[in-house]
Amino acid sequence: MIRLVLFDIDGTLIQTGGAGVQAFGRAFATEFNIPNSAERLKFSGRTDTGLARELFLQNQIEPSPENLRLFFDGYVFWLDYLLTQTRGGVLPGVWEFVRQLHALPEPPALGLLTGNIRLGAEIKLRHFELWEVFQTGAFGDDHEDRNQIAAIAKDRGSRLLNNDLRGEQILVIGDTSRDIECALAIGARTLVVATGSVPFEELEAHRPDWLVKDLTSVAATQVCGAN
């Protein structure tokens, strides 16, 4: 039986109308006077810290702790502003699926497994009134490697539940092959939604446990029952 459900954010729970990508570019332009710097980055399934480090190296700037702090201070400022200017939203089926999880006879804990830095995740999810849904999580400022973020999320979930969780008791929900890979790294089950930028057929090739068009196409009882 699933005891912990870990959600990715962008392309899985919400889409921000480009606010996150724009905030990356504006922060770098504002803090380091280099415009259009984020246009070459591939964001899907990546961690914010890994993306920022790549951006620094592409522009011959030292990715020092001080420079990263300066960048992310600018990023969260712009993210908060741009979310009010872009047309994003909660993706289809998310609220109903969460309601179904809460209604299970033994509801699992709900957490986040995301490449977003924690403050960025909070800003995005508070904007869409989803932040309070989650009890635990691991983030892009915990580690640059998503597999390590998954391990941290598993450990935090175990502490929350006062139970050393086995991988098969965890369900990871995401929209990219990287979500599948990090779930496999901790032995978790995978539910993948084709609501992000990756085509259904490409996701299918990675053989997740469940693959659906969106969360309207699956019931919590299907994916959280006894194994």
Which residues does each PLM region occupy?
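Acidic, Mg2+-coordinating phosphoryl-transfer loop and its flanking beta/alpha structural elements
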Residues: V172-W210
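An amphipathic alpha-helix signature
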Residues: V21-G25, T49, R53, F72, ...
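Short, surface-exposed acidic
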Residues: F32-K42, Q60-F71, W131-F134, N163-G167
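Substrate-recognition "cap/lid" segment bordering the active-site pocket of phosphatases
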Residues: G88-G89, G111, N116-V172, S177-I186
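Helix-loop "lid/cap" segments that line or gate small-molecule binding pockets
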Residues: T49-P63, A153-K154
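Short, acidic loop-to-helix structural element flanking the phosphoryl-transfer center
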Residues: L6, P65, D80-L112, R118
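Structural recognition of alpha->loop->beta junctions
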Residues: E129-G137, E202-T221
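Active-site neighborhood of HAD-like aspartate-dependent phosphohydrolases
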Residues: M1-S44, G50, F56-Q58
